[in-house]
């Protein structure tokens, strides 16, 4: 029986994870790589970072060649997202629950989990991206804006190997479709269509992304420079609840999933806002373990609020009461943080969100 349960757990877990990966808009291989997936019980993964390439020198047949030394640094990806599935199935014990009922609950779990992973992944991208603010995007200027991003990425030696992507809001996709330079996916092959790519422009594969983050228009990037670790800490299984003391003749579909995201190079990820976003800097606070955020541009008035590691992002014109963040005074409010935390800061005018910023806390931003 134990072997059967273990086999079912492995099968269910693989089914859900496969469905999750199929549902992700910010997909593995398209937006994120999975190069550092490993032990799901670890709280963090140390990732080597090298911005320089291996030195190539002339070889001396008599004396050989001197050994060169690379400059490898390390960055930390926190495995800080811990989500659980615990769905009650009434009137069935674990041994008698129908397969189609389990399949329905697994399908629902995969959908909900994929949405949350997409949300958390996008927040990490925005907090680690290089920001480009544009007053207005139109059918007349959108191509030149994308070409400028392409130029900046090429100057930063981001590979132009067919993997550069654009995540585009629906209203911006409508502008792209009017561009004569836009190549529709039907001309790019079946594999491109299957990946959800609408088309290609200036070397970027464009995928529509229905996101409501205030003023966000699109994200450009390359999967080599953003990574995701995505693992089951406890595999999906059907748990009998007869011994719980509360449930009789019932079971539950349970599982626990841990994951994390990390931007490895800010210049490889570009977030475009129109008409713009807040510009924010961080500095150590006065108290140990704190940071202070100073808004330097992009604001209307001086009313701000923040959230630490938000589970969703602020939409334009969200009311202050609906947002529910903590009040922030620019340059004064001290926020208790740890390295790798993400701070969302919103600018409120007439009681509504008008602009946002996302920023990842570095060790140098925290008072020791």
Residue ranges, per PLM feature:
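Sequence/fold signature of self-assembling virion shell proteins
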Residues: 2-31, 36-55, 75-79, 86, ...
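Alpha-helical scaffold segments that mediate packing/assembly in large oligomeric complexes
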Residues: 91-158, 271-274
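Extended, solvent-exposed, turn-rich assembly/linker loops in the middle of proteins
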Residues: 129-197, 319
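Short coil/turn motif common to extracellular beta-sandwich-like domains
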Residues: 284-295, 299
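Short proline/glycine-enriched turn/loop motifs at strand-loop junctions of beta-rich domains
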Residues: 297-304, 311
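Surface-exposed, short loops/turns at beta-strand junctions within beta-sandwich domains
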Residues: 329-342
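Extracellular recognition modules
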Residues: 342-348
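Extracellular fibronectin type III
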Residues: 352-365
